[in-house]
């Protein structure tokens, strides 16, 4: 039956008949319920829930007995420290070996019951019991920030939209790995430096990613550009983001910036040259050793002036969005030497 009375009236009706309903016998309850459903329009099951006695107190949560108390936790801490703070999954198979040794040397004095608990405790339970002591051992940090992280935080971020037509001398720097199909072991890498204003690009081979060799390659590249370098923009590679390299760049008067992590478009200029120059010229093979490094350097000596003096390239002038379509307009293609009025100073010294 459709509801014919208001909510306030239904509430008053419940208050009027609820005590009589609860104190009646089964037959009378059925008759009262029929009348109540007919008047209010409630579903019969809902009417029963409204009229039946409410529980005086909610059911209490189930209480579980504590199996691994503080004495188990203290013994686990001793085992954890003795194992050089291993994770629980590695510590569990080591407990049968460590436990007799610690008891033999007086570090632990355990009852048979406590000893059995330590031998049967699961790795997940060990994680829960050791969670607080692990936070204290870390000094309250989730993980320790290394020196490279501190150096990275000290270097300001520069995105692809922050350049605003700089003067010649601000370069993006990146590594191209000549590792072939395997990145294991030591292999030659090419340091690529691309000037933002002119597109002038220099490539310097590096035998390993050691910071001293990185500094030597940067210093060598400075002598190859036809204008003085003003700033370097690195990615977040640890070969660049370390105290030695960053401090050297700043001591040379170079402005040091970095791109955002996992945002390759922040270094779009040098990323384009990685493929257009290095990969196109050298390919994807594996190069190893001093002899390969020297040969690669001689190759770059031959092609550097050809690309920078005679190879015209496009440079974006403006970009306009029209609905879902992006329209790009470019300056007329010219070689890097013709951009920015850069004076030609042929540097050597590779």
From Swiss-Prot:
Keywords tagged on the record: Plasmid
Descriptive protein name: Uncharacterized protein y4rM
PROSITE patterns: INTEGRASE (PS50994)
Superkingdom in the source lineage: Bacteria
GO BP annotations, alphabetical order: DNA integration
Domain Integrase catalytic: start-end pairs: 164-327
GO molecular function: nucleic acid binding
Classification via InterPro entries: Integrase_cat-core (IPR001584), RNaseH-like_sf (IPR012337), RNaseH_sf (IPR036397)
Disulfide bonds: none
């Amino acid at each position: 039956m459709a509801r014919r009375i208001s909510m306030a009236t239904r509430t008053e009706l419940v208050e009027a008949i609820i005590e009589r309903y609860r104190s009646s016998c089964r037959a009378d309850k059925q008759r009262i319920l029929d009348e109540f459903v007919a008047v209010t329009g409630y579903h019969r099951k809902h009417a029963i829930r409204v009229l039946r006695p409410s529980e005086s107190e909610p059911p209490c949560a189930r209480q579980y007995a504590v199996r691994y108390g503080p004495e188990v936790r203290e013994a686990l801490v001793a085992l954890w420290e003795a194992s050089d703070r291993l994770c629980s999954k590695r510590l569990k198979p080591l407990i049968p070996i460590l436990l007799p040794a610690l008891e033999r040397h007086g570090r632990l004095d355990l009852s048979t019951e406590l000893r059995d608990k330590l031998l049967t405790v699961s790795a997940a339970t060990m994680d829960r019991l050791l969670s607080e002591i692990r936070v204290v051992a870390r000094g309250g940090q989730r993980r320790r920030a290394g020196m490279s992280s501190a150096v990275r935080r000290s270097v300001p971020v520069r995105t692809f939209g922050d350049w605003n037509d700089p003067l010649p001398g601000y370069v993006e720097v990146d590594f191209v790995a000549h590792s072939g199909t395997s990145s294991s072991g030591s292999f030659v890498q090419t340091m690529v430096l691309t000037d933002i204003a002119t597109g002038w690009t220099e490539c310097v081979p590096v035998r390993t990613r050691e910071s001293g060799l990185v500094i030597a390659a940067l210093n060598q590249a400075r002598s190859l550009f036809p204008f003085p370098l003003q700033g370097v923009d690195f990615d977040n590679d640890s070969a660049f983001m370390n105290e030695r390299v960053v401090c050297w760049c700043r001591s040379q008067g170079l402005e040091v910036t970095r791109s955002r992590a996992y945002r390759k478009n922040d270094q779009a200029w040098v990323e384009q040259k990685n493929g257009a120059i290095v990969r196109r010229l050298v390919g994807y093979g594996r190069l190893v050793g001093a002899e390969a490094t020297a040969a690669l350097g001689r190759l770059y000596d031959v092609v550097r002036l050809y690309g920078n003096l005679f190879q015209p390239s496009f440079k974006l002038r403006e970009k306009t969005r029209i609905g879902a379509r992006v329209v790009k307009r470019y300056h007329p293609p010219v070689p890097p030497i013709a951009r920015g009025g850069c004076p030609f100073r042929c540097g050597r010294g590779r």
